[in-house]
Structures are given as C-alpha cells and as structure tokens.
C-alpha cells in the first residue's frame, strides 16, 4: 500500500507520523512510503534518513494526500488537510473528536476512514497508544508548573525541591493514572512532597508498591 506522511502543520507540533526506522520496517514489508519534504526536520530527522530507509520525498502535502492510500499523522487534521482527504482514504492519527464538531463533520463529509490512536484498545481494555502521550503530559506538567512558580513568572517564588534550610513545595496530584503516575515521578525526583488522590484504593496500593520497589532498587 502507499503510505503518506505529511508534515504536521498544527501550531507548536514538531513531531512526525513515522520515524525513519518505522519507514524501513514498512518498506521491508512491501509498502511504499512517501514523506513530505523536510517533514521530520523539527523532530530531528533529515530527508536523507528517510530516503536511506526506502521512502520517497514529496514536494508538498497535496502530493501526499492525492497519492497515498493511508495517511499517517500525529495530530488531528487541520482545515486545509481535511479538504484534501479523499473518500475511502485511511487516516491514522490522534483525533480527539469529542470537542471538535467542525472536524468531525468534515471527516464524515469526506467519507474517509479514520482511526484515532487514543481509542485503540487492547484485549485488557487498556489504551496502549494513548499511554505514551499521557506519560509525556504528566512529566511536562510538573516541569511547567515548577517554572510557573518562579517570581519572574508571577509565581510565589517557590523552589519546588527546596534548598538547604528551606522547605520544598507540596504537590497534590488528582488521579493516579498514567498522567498522575508520571507527574509523581518527576515531582518526587525534584524532592517535592507528593500526594496522589484517586478514587481507586487498588490503584493507590499499586502505586505504593511501585514506590517501595523503586526505593529498594535504589538501595541495591
């Protein structure tokens, strides 16, 4: 099949749908992969890395949407992309349609086939493609929060991890899922006092066991 990888155009989105290593795997399976010119540049991948992996380079997103049977993206299609999606074209990406009425209507009108990464579920009811995004979000939340506590950001001037003779901050995390767990990892690493609130007692016990194992591993 012809698989197209356009450059992401959503503001502040610098990732790309496929890495050169993923392209190499798909090409070895007999697929044709087309990557937009400099599509992976902001993610640290050069055109040459994609061509070495077996991909072809397209001059524009329009060429990709016009030629590919499958479109592989990271974030939801923007208006200009929706207008290029063809009937029966398959689109893989994070869609988050619940709060995007216009996008939902546009995709329905295009009669395309859309697979949202965030709703892909494994046999155990977990969301394996959403978990990595949630992990990043959790870790970034503490990093961003610590930055906002600085005085020059109109914060309280609090150093989250404290300093010799100065108490650190207290972090309260609502929810002990993937986001919450990863937020706790970073906050704990910064030596803040961390409290997690979750409605599931079983999940809280699981997190406590993970913490205890982490301490044991450090001692050994």
Tell where the protein language model's regions lie, with residue ranges.
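Glycine/serine-rich phosphate-binding loop and adjoining beta1-alpha1 elements at the start
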Residues: 2, 8, 79-169
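An N-terminal-biased, well-structured beta-alpha scaffold segment characteristic
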Residues: 2-106, 110
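Glycine-rich phosphate/diphosphate-binding loop of Rossmann-like nucleotide-binding domains
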Residues: 6-7, 11-42, 154-220
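Generic secondary-structure signature for well-ordered alpha-helical cores
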Residues: 28-32, 55-56, 70-73, 109-113, ...
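Short beta->alpha connector loops at strand-helix junctions that form conserved
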Residues: 36-37, 60-61, 94-96, 116-121, ...
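Short low-complexity, flexible loop/linker segments enriched in glycine and/or proline
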Residues: 48-52, 74, 129-133, 209-213, ...
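Short, basic, helix/turn surface patches
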Residues: 58-70, 138-151, 220
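Residue-level detector of alpha-helix initiation sites
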Residues: 76, 136, 177-179
């Amino acid at each position: 099949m012809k698989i197209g990888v356009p450059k992401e155009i959503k503001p502040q989105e610098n990732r790309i749908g496929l890495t050169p290593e993923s392209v190499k795997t798909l090409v070895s399976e007999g697929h044709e992969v087309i990557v937009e010119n400099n599509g992976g540049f902001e993610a640290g991948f050069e055109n040459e890395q994609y061509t070495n992996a077996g991909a072809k380079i397209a001059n524009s997103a329009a060429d990709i949407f016009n030629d590919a049977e499958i479109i592989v993206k990271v974030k939801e299609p923007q208006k200009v992309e929706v207008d290029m999606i063809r009937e029966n074209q398959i689109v893989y990406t994070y869609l988050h349609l619940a709060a995007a009425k216009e996008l939902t209507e546009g995709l329905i009108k295009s009669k395309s086939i859309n697979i949202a990464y965030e709703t892909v579920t494994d046999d155990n009811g977990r969301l394996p493609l959403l978990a990595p995004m949630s992990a990043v979000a959790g870790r970034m939340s503490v990093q961003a929060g610590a930055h906002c506590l600085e005085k020059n950001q109109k914060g309280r001037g609090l150093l989250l991890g404290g300093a010799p003779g100065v108490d650190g901050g207290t972090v309260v995390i609502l929810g002990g899922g993937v986001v919450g767990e990863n937020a706790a990892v970073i906050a704990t690493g910064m030596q803040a006092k961390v409290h997690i609130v979750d409605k599931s007692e079983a999940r809280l016990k699981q997190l406590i066991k993970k913490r205890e194992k982490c301490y044991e591993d450090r001692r050994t």
